């Protein structure tokens, strides 16, 4: 499969990390503990990469960042839904690695080491203010949106670092977050979470 910038994907995303609420990394401040351990998940509700349909597939990215996110190199592992066929797997890898341009090309500039790209059984659920992800044998993450005035979502807009730069980010709290792979092991709860819809496209 050749690299193309003729693509667009839409869906929902969420993440959790070890930072206190709200994670200061999105404001280009240092992580709460000096390092950030984050797992980010996306569910593609509709998508197409140069003719390859991507509807209904999940993707996740685990990252270890030993300092301010824009000042140090990230160590990352990418997970692609095992239901993806060969063409879909290649398309999603090109998109989320930044090779196909768009938002992830900018994110890729911060990556210093890719420790793995693999397919895995993934279960992503979005219901109301709750989000959950299971990567079989590797990770489990569950967050719940926090209530603002009159129960409305608490949101962050126009933050300089964002997984989805053109959508308000809903602030959430983790109920559970475990990850174990590539020599990294995290077991957290009661920490930061974010979620929002997303639309990404090539240049």
Task: For each feature predicted by the language model, list its residue ranges.
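Short linear motifs at secondary-structure transitions and domain/linker junctions
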Residues: 13-20, 35-36, 50-56, 108-111, ...
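Aromatic- and glycine-enriched beta-alpha-beta binding-site module
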Residues: 34-104
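Residues in flexible loops and secondary-structure boundaries
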Residues: 17, 22-27, 33, 50-52, ...
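Charged linear interaction tracts used for macromolecular binding and regulation
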Residues: 74, 78-157, 162
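Extended, charged low-complexity segments
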Residues: 148-203
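N-terminal ordered "arm"
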Residues: 2-49
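Short amphipathic beta-strand and strand-loop transition segments with alternating hydrophobic
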Residues: 25, 61-66, 120-124
């Amino acid at each position: 499969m050749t690299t193309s910038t003729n693509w667009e994907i839409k869906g929902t995303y969420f993440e959790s990390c070890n930072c206190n609420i709200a994670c200061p990394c999105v404001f280009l401040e240092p992580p709460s503990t000096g390092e950030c351990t984050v797992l980010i998940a996306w569910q593609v509700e509709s998508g197409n990469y140069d003719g390859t349909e991507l509807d209904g597939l999940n993707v996740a990215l685990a990252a270890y960042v030993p300092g301010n996110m824009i000042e140090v190199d990230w160590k990352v592992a990418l997970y692609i839904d095992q239901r993806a066929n060969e063409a879909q797997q290649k398309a999603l890898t090109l998109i989320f690695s930044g090779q196909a341009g768009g938002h992830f090309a900018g994110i890729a500039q911060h990556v210093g080491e890719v420790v793995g790209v693999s397919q895995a059984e993934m279960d992503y659920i979005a219901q109301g203010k709750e989000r959950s992800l299971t990567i079989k044998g590797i990770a489990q993450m569950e967050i719940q949106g926090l209530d603002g005035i009159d129960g409305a979502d608490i949101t962050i807009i126009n933050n300089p670092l964002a997984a989805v730069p053109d959508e308000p980010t809903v602030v959430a709290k983790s109920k559970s977050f475990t990850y174990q792979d590539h020599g990294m092991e995290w077991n957290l709860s009661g920490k930061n979470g974010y979620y929002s819809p997303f639309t990404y496209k090539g240049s």
